[in-house]
Amino acid sequence: STAKDTNPPDSLLFQTLLSEGNTEKALELSEKILEESRNLAERDFEAEAWIRMERALLGAIEPANVGNELRWCVDRLASINPGSPLHGLALLNLASWHRNSNERMMALVTLADISSDAGHPVDLIGLSRLESGRILSLIGDLEPAMRHLWMAMRRLSSSEMSAEAVVCAMEWLDIALDDIDPDSPTMDERILGAKPREKPGMTTIPSNPNDIKESVEIILTNALKDVSGDHRDDLGLILDASEIIEEPKWREAIEERRSEIQDPRLIEVLQS
């Protein structure tokens, strides 16, 4: 084997330093990689875009230039490897930057570019729908927020990101418990029948009790693995759902673990 085979490439070392939290050394190495990359006859444009993205996120460039740098990375990856995991990640990072800059509509537009039609992986599509749902919820546009959170829950469940799927289920349930109607279409039916809208609105929809049950089961299965902790919003939501749709078995499942519960709010509710 050649020396090239036995020595790990600098980009791999860069990744290792990042994962170990050694930011200073990673940034030093990244400057060397970018310098060498510019001098190579065959530049690795994908690695270059990835490293520039990481540098922007780590604060290695002026804050005023971060947005432009992240946009450059998205455009470069879109031209050389559209639909790749790295392209999807670059879009997520750009959307996050827009959201943090209070540019919510730009964040939503950017997140919409992550899709199965574009060839992005299921887990990144799920994460993008979760972010879209959160932004729409913040705006108060709850009908599409609920659809996005539901799609995110389904996508992340199917890609074995169970912790993230639970987060989606919780955020969906928190909205859904405000308005329940047995005659309401299920979320799957709403997603199938969804049509593009000309402009955002402040819409709300009632939820179907069957969807409430599905989301609670996802949350409960995870929550019962360990019920300790001082702030257990997941268990609190389940108790709310148990009362609102009159499903005592969920409360009973939590009551069986009462001695392990530490959240004072839950202890008070369970004593009432």
Region roles according to the model:
Residues 1, 18-32, 59-75, 99-113, ...:
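Helix-turn-helix repeat elements of alpha-solenoid scaffolds
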Residues 2, 9, 22, 41-44, ...:
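Short coil/turn linker motifs that delimit alpha-helical repeat modules in TPR/alpha-solenoid proteins
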Residues 5, 42-47, 86, 124, ...:
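Structural signature of alpha-solenoid helical repeat junctions
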Residues 8, 46-50, 89, 127-129, ...:
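Residue register of alpha-helical TPR repeats
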Residues 15, 50, 55-57, 96, ...:
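Residue-level recognition of tetratricopeptide repeat
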Residues 19-20, 57-63, 97-100, 138, ...:
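Alpha-helix C-terminal capping/termination sites
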Residues 31-38, 71-79, 112-119, 150-158, ...:
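Amphipathic alpha-helical segments of tetratricopeptide repeats
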Residues 146-157, 173, 184-201, 212-221, ...:
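TPR/TPR-like (Sel1-like) alpha-helical repeat modules
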